[in-house]
């Protein structure tokens, strides 16, 4: 699975959506020129939905996004009918415009994020109305016949202040022992903070997962957290919930703590 942006960079509101045909053509061409030859089984993309505004330049984001996505997906799937396409959709800009989103090409799986309070938030505190978040998840789950997925957060994230795109091919995970140890200690402090709230609020992750169908694509962001060195406790808890959410939360937490590789910050 490979990922790239369709029609935007880092500022949705600065995106020009006046020519959706051109945007769709460019997105399809980028796949054809840069990714098709790599023989991946699928692609993940985001477009101009990561904002709390409903419009860009007077155009409704939900309507424009669906039009552009369907055009680009059709062009790609015409040549690559077996390709899996995942659409990373931010609910913040389309929350009240689901009548448009239901028209996304059924061959495209929508991976929803920013759908309310935790587990859709970066910090695993319970801020907001969980019952409303649960109800919205139920609504989008049944919105359309195409693939459905959720993206949970509340774990480590990229430091966007220092982030840079890789300029080319590179070897993953090759650092000195000192570099790894220093990074581990840096991230341990962050994981300790997250871990405290997972201990209190993992039950809400369980409640969301319990209402999802077995066919749901359930994903989570674990970014820049030295995950390749340690399986941090929140990740272990999340994994146990996915494995079988139909258990008492205390049982799930205990099983996660007993995982040999699980690490407490």
For the regions a protein language model found, what residue spans apply to each?
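Catalytic-core regions of glycoside hydrolase
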Residues: 1-264
